[in-house]
């Protein structure tokens, strides 16, 4: 898969650290919050957030110490020349019509016809 060649090991380590951090922040599935308590918490959070000043956008959030070092001695996740092609490829994939994402040969209709006759490049997807 050509996608594996684009992502560096350092980026994978950053993704892993981010995932670990998010998993620590997520509540356990065993914890059940009553709807009334949840709505009260939402109201309290809304009141607190409305009292806070406007926060700058994400690229401007990193302070000078984060820009120079970061946790792993690397720069932050900013829009660098290295990540720009990856972002554009991901954006193009998300913006592509569903049939283009699904099919690698002729299109959805031809793939279904090929699957019925065991011909075509994506016949394994539609077997029943």
UniProtKB/Swiss-Prot annotation:
GO terms for biological process: blood vessel diameter maintenance; cGMP biosynthetic process; cGMP-mediated signaling; female pregnancy; negative regulation of systemic arterial blood pressure; neuropeptide signaling pathway; receptor guanylyl cyclase signaling pathway; regulation of blood pressure. Signal peptide: none annotated. The precursor molecule is proteolytically cleaved by CORIN at Arg-98 to produce atrial natriuretic peptide. Undergoes further proteolytic cleavage by unknown proteases to give rise to long-acting natriuretic peptide, vessel dilator and kaliuretic peptide. Additional processing gives rise to the auriculin and atriopeptin peptides. In the kidneys, alternative processing by an unknown protease results in the peptide urodilatin. Keywords: Cell projection, Disulfide bond, Hormone, Phosphoprotein, Secreted, Vasoactive. One of its GO terms (molecular function) is hormone activity. Residues 68-78 form a propeptide. One of its GO terms (cellular component) is extracellular space. This is Natriuretic peptides A.
């Amino acid at each position: 898969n050509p996608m594996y060649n684009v992502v560096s090991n350092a980026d994978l380590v950053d993704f892993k650290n981010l995932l670990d951090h998010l998993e620590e922040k997520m509540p356990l599935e065993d914890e059940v919050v009553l709807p009334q308590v949840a709505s009260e918490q939402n109201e309290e959070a809304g009141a607190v957030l409305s009292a806070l000043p406007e926060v700058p956008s994400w690229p401007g959030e990193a302070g000078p110490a984060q820009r120079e070092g970061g946790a792993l001695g690397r720069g932050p996740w900013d829009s660098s020349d290295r990540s720009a092609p990856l972002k554009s490829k991901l954006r193009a994939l998300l913006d592509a019509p569903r049939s283009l994402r699904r099919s690698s040969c002729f299109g959805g209709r031809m793939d279904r016809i090929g699957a019925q006759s065991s011909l075509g490049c994506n016949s394994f997807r539609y077997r029943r």
